[in-house]
């Protein structure tokens, strides 16, 4: 046993969210229960390739996430965790984090790897740190409207790409933190009573 930690991200939309309990059953059948962490992420229309009608609104996803955690707890999974401070925001806005696509083009954000117009360089040439696109990423600032938000330490303004596109990038925890705390409280009591 090598003590490897596996984290599985399940991208959900209005179609597949109804089946989230089945995937947990499948992991158990494979003998993976207790050997991995699982979390949900909403499908988004970041690059215009998917149907927006299938995507969740922020509050809908927050409810789906809470439902998923409840199902997981009922099935004996223990991936219930409180959100932690996110001091790094996103690798895309840090100076030394890059994404390289199969062609060798360099980007700051994974969502941009299919968009040649978003590349900031390539692996065959030195990176120009004065490149306008590069500077735009690393000069990201937390929006003023976020500075008074009680969950700022968790999201740090949210996804910079969503922030640019939609002017709002609030994570599910903004809408479900009270339910999440209630779940943690209930689960902790049950664990204590064992």
What are the residue ranges of the model-derived segments?
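Sequence-level detector for tyrosine residue identity
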Residues: 26, 39, 77, 98, ...
